[in-house]
Amino acid sequence: MWLLSSSPWLSELSCSYSAVVEHTSSVPVPIQWLRFVLLSPCPQRALFSAVDFIFLLCFALHKLFSSPSSSSEINGHAEIRKPLIGIRGRTPTRTTAWFKTTVAVTVLLSFCSVVLCVLAFTGKRRTQRPWNLIDPLFWLIHAVTHLVIAVLVLHQKRFAALNHPLSLRIYWISSFVLTSLFAVTGIFHFLSDAATSLRAEDVASFFSFPLTAFLLIASVRGITGLVTAETNSPTKPSDAVSVEKSDNVSLYASASVFSKTFWLWMNPLLSKGYKSPLTLEQVPTLSPEHKAERLALLFESSWPKPSENSSHPIRTTLLRCFWKEILFTAILAIVRLGVMYVGPVLIQSFVDFTSGKRSSPWQGYYLVLILLVAKFVEVLTTHQFNFDSQKLGMLIRSTLITALYKKGLKLTGSARQNHGVGQIVNYMAVDAQQLSDMMLQLHAIWLMPLQVTVALVLLYGSLGASVITAVIGLTGVFVFILLGTQRNNGYQFSLMGNRDSRMKATNEMLNYMRVIKFQAWENHFNKRILKFRDMEFGWLSKFLYSIAGNIIVLWSTPVLISALTFATALALGVKLDAGTVFTTTTIFKILQEPIRTFPQSMISLSQAMISLGRLDSYMMSKELSEDAVERALGCDGNTAVEVRDGSFSWDDEDNEPALSDINFKVKKGELTAIVGTVGSGKSSLLASVLGEMHRISGQVRVCGSTGYVAQTSWIENGTVQDNILFGLPMVREKYNKVLNVCSLEKDLQMMEFGDKTEIGERGINLSGGQKQRIQLARAVYQECDVYLLDDVFSAVDAHTGSDIFKKCVRGALKGKTVLLVTHQVDFLHNVDCILVMRDGKIVESGKYDELVSSGLDFGELVAAHETSMELVEAGADSAAVATSPRTPTSPHASSPRTSMESPHLSDLNDEHIKSFLGSHIVEDGSKLIKEEERETGQVSLGVYKQYCTEAYGWWGIVLVLFFSLTWQGSLMASDYWLAYETSAKNAISFDASVFILGYVIIALVSIVLVSIRSYYVTHLGLKTAQIFFRQILNSILHAPMSFFDTTPSGRILSRASTDQTNVDILIPFMLGLVVSMYTTLLSIFIVTCQYAWPTAFFVIPLGWLNIWYRNYYLASSRELTRMDSITKAPIIHHFSESIAGVMTIRSFRKQELFRQENVKRVNDNLRMDFHNNGSNEWLGFRLELVGSWVLCISALFMVLLPSNVIRPENVGLSLSYGLSLNSVLFFAIYMSCFVENKMVSVERIKQFTDIPSESEWERKETLPPSNWPFHGNVHLEDLKVRYRPNTPLVLKGITLDIKGGEKVGVVGRTGSGKSTLIQVLFRLVEPSGGKIIIDGIDISTLGLHDLRSRFGIIPQEPVLFEGTVRSNIDPTEQYSDEEIWKSLERCQLKDVVATKPEKLDSLVVDNGENWSVGQRQLLCLGRVMLKRSRLLFLDEATASVDSQTDAVIQKIIREDFASCTIISIAHRIPTVMDGDRVLVIDAGKAKEFDSPARLLERPSLFAALVQEYALRSAGI
């Protein structure tokens, strides 16, 4: 090779023209000049001397111009940390291992330079030419420089310097580059024909190289390693303190450089994991510098200022935060690139050595030693690069999640709707992860051209001009890959968009599963999600088949380009021997890495750019304006809330006001009620006071802190106590008082764990009234100045509402400013002021009597209420008579009792009635949300079997193995053919055409086999992924309601997103790669042991060591991966929960509390990720080191074995395979571990495919007649219900008959079991005993859809799905537009919908948030009116509408459902007064069941309830 020639420039110090240019050489002159400048001793010494001189000059000038005054302290301690300044004062310091190592390295370099200087001056010189003085002078300057640096570093402790000076850092970087050139020159000189022994300067350069590499790292880090008393840390004051105080901080925080270099800090954790499965508590916390709270501050401080007008703020900020880490990984990548080509270059030397062309008997051992050192440096830099890149990715993900969360708490309402909760969750779960993963691929983009250039230069030395064919071939491959990348970019973009849509639909389905089951809409949502999935699957298939095409090109490139290059070389007359051929094939194999990683890097880059764009869009979304409301904690004067000339809109971009001409003033301590019809703007008015709406004009002023109770309850997943305290400390006396005034004491008494009872997701195990009272208690406990209560009485019964109004609103909150939105006219004469709203304007305001006399809007509301109360008051009069003292001659005393008749007054004593009026029961008080189950130990073979055989059984596995083995066999055949044709004994009969023809045929067979294999693996993966998706979707839809009550949606969503993505893409790809790696590893062992057979004796124990390492590592890694998955779900859940309750959080100013909780959850997750990455590189370093030892042992035996035993061509073949042993061995074992960790996703999906299902949806053998129910007769016989085994009964033996067409009202205290009765009639909860017979059919014998689809229901909480008015009122598309309009007209919404431009296609956002709660309830009524069921259930259906609208709805129901059986749960007594019968439920028992009139004639519980409802206003 031309680099190993005996040219004089390689060994002489002459800088003459003759030493540079050899006119007889075939090497071009520019290349000779480049070679001379970089690798010749003369310019090297000149460059190094210049660098030394410049540094010494800078040092001298700095000392010269440092005045004595600079030694004094400036601003306290400002100058104490500046090095090179003579500070006389002493500061207490502590040295770390980093400082000590730096000192040791500088002293060693100084010693080495001094020794070489002495040798240069005392050594014998052959001639007295002038340039012979270059060497001694160079070493003299070099020795002086290193001595100065050693003294400087030692004096840093005296001056308490925390950072190295910039001049020193620049010098160390330059020194590393130049020392690298010295070392390369030394290697080439040793390998050259003229070399007889190693020179002293060559040995010195080999010795100095790792030392300067350490100083390079020191220059990038910048810190000296000294810790002063002021800081206690080289980075942050708080870091060291936190390390000392924490008992279980990651050992990385305090690890020495040596420990970090070889991942020794991971040993204790891996040891624990090997002995027993790791638990969450055993995994150490993150180092302080890696914690989310520190990174969040760094991100905020680096965010571009508005004046910068940055169009890509995320990218800019991340670069500012992590440029040092990016630079350090880039340096590692360059060092790795520098040593990875040493092996291919040495192949020719090994072949020459075994051929007898040796300059020294020791040359073989030197070659083995160089190979060992080069592989060691390659392995170390590779895994340090991987670890630091993954750590950087982890830091970026942590930074982004906390930033996204903080932004979520600031978004305006319209911005929140534009992005949607599902998409925002994807920003955290997908886009942040995408940018994190990108860090491992980042440097491959610019390293690829450099790596290819180096390879081509080396190839040019071996093959000359024929390398042009390789350039053309590689260019063609790159063009194909680039076009494929561009195509994949489009596929990936569409795939992510469709995945977002599927996740959004899945999230919506999970949130409203109760309504879906009530309406028997599972099939509709199944089709809807499958429609999204089919679109996603189409893009997924295109994406994966395109990737498979890229893989085929990548795997085929070495043989294809080799064939073209060898053909060109023979055509040009280049002699091909074993050394040249196998050096070439090895270089092409090395080029596989940039060819493989470049397209993947481009894909990752394109995905990252898409993600950056999405995140930029989100982070630049509008935030709530801080000046929308003028806030003051202490205000002079009497005004607490004031709005002047206010106009407000929900849309930031639209100036069409939702509220206009708003003018009102509330004095301190006043109770102001806000009333109006449905959709008049009452809730919006409260939002405007809170600053939640876009202020178009006007002024809002609020004095003091605010507390908000939303109309739709927002409850956190946690304990009752946590929800009430809401971040404040427990004050028991105050806490108990709050429980009392919010009527929660008896509820808590009935709960198994009292206020420690865990509340399910979205308060699923609480009644509507209990949720409302808990969030009211939360507000009262906060002791705010201004309270905004949005319809807090709608979800509670009359007695509870009266109690809360008296004890809470007029009691505990007396003296506070309260704005109360209410439909309860009864309370209005006890308020200080009333605001009446219509169409977004305040049309009236004043006191009760003033407004009634005006006869306008308020008068209509009061009139409607009084009309509805007439029946109640008449009943109350009867009740008063019934409950008056009676004589034994009273005619009522002898009236016969029905089976359900109430007991007489003698039985219903005062305590009994009081107990009933104040009783509450919780339906289930035990711990509801279960800890997520996780498998421990090895992933079972059953999971692998289920995945691999799901598509085509065992035949799928057999075919993959067959094609993999035959493909690898064809690759081996091509290399055996090269070895045979280039052997010495075949040289005489060598036929170029036969050589090329044979190689091309083998190459084509290899390409065909790898194509079949790749496409088949892709097909298997896609088919399996779709099967798994359909299985889990089907399982979830068939799951009983109890499953959703006890399983947070975050757990299901994590399986539908992260786990499904793993099954879609990662697992099939990686599983195919594992098979390829193991077949490649098998081929390497066969070839290596075939020609260096003694190596087999070492392979067996080293192979056992590999297996032991794998099992030792996997025991911990598997659990860390599982815990990583488990700790991800709480981040998602907490985020979506926070977005849902953001108005409540903001009103109480609790953003910081929730941000800290987010930070805590992020840290919990990232510590798993960090230690998992550490364990991966711990394993990788050791495995690759073992592979390198096997290679070097094999090379040593090739040197030791006589030439008649091992032929040169076999040496080339063996080394070309052996050089990739370390990386293939690592990737084979690492990928198998990676696959096992990712197989946890299959395991997790499998958990949810085995959920116990509810009963069949349809039963053909018991299909009811099409017109069933015929009459609506309902018979309950000893009905008993409990929610889960071993829990108390909720309904305790109810027996009753309801005749067809009867209107039955169900009343009872909050949590008494009313809603449970409806659930059991729909079989959302199966009876624990008894029967339910409807029109002669036992409903337990019917299919669930056959049952539920025949009933109509308006649920307690109105639910709208994202879509349009049409898709919400008729989701199954069974009715015509005419029928829909008629239904909307009957439910009072026709005018509202008709005024919208899109009419029936008007937008409904997630949960119908662009419609008022009352309008949502009316739309739900419209659904039922279309259905026209014979049996109708109303679960507090009019709780959120005013009395006027309630009266209209009741009238509609009476007219449209006159012949239907109606079972209505109601808190408003007027809604049941005109019913046929009333069912009174108390503590799960049917206490009374009779007509309202008969119940009022005697001292019944119902009579007491009616009387209390009628008189509650008077008593307030």
UniProtKB/Swiss-Prot annotation:
Residues 879-904 are annotated as: Disordered. Induction: By salicylic acid (SA), menadione and, to a lower extent, by 1-chloro-2,4-dinitrobenzene (CDNB), benoxacor, cloquintocet, fenchlorazol and fluorazol. InterPro entries: AAA+_ATPase, ABC1_TM_dom, ABC1_TM_sf, ABC_transporter-like_ATP-bd, ABC_transporter-like_CS, ABC_transporter_C-like, ABCC_6TM_D1, ABCC_6TM_D2. Inhibited by methotrexate. Disruption phenotype: Plants have larger stomatal aperture and increased drought susceptibility, but are not affected by the ABA signal transduction pathway. The keyword 4Fe-4S does not apply. The chain crosses the membrane at residues 46-66, 103-123, 133-153, 170-190, 203-223, 326-346, 361-381, 439-459, 463-483, 551-571, 953-973, 992-1012, 1067-1087, 1089-1109, 1186-1206, 1211-1231. Residues 884-901 have a biased composition (Polar residues). The keyword Transit peptide does not apply. It catalyses: ATP + H2O + xenobioticSide 1 = ADP + phosphate + xenobioticSide 2. It comes from the Eukaryota. Residues 326-607, 957-1237 form the ABC transmembrane type-1 domain. One of its GO terms (cellular component) is vacuole. ATP 2 binds at G1308, R1309, T1310, G1311, S1312, G1313, K1314, S1315. It is a multi-pass membrane protein. One of its GO terms (molecular function) is ABC-type xenobiotic transporter activity. It is found in: Cell membrane; Vacuole membrane. Residues 641-864, 1274-1508 form the ABC transporter domain. CDD domains: ABC_6TM_ABCC_D1, ABC_6TM_ABCC_D2, ABCC_MRP_domain1, ABCC_MRP_domain2. Ubiquitous. High expression in the guard cells. ATP 1 binds at G676, T677, V678, G679, S680, G681, K682, S683. Its EC number is 7.6.2.2. Keywords: ATP-binding, Cell membrane, Membrane, Nucleotide-binding, Repeat, Translocase, Transmembrane, Transmembrane helix, Transport, Vacuole. Belongs to the ABC transporter superfamily. ABCC family. Conjugate transporter (TC 3.A.1.208) subfamily. Involved in the regulation of stomatal aperture. May function as a high-capacity pump for folates. This is ABC transporter C family member 4. It comes from Arabidopsis thaliana (Mouse-ear cress). The lineage of its organism: Eukaryota, Viridiplantae, Streptophyta, Embryophyta, Tracheophyta.
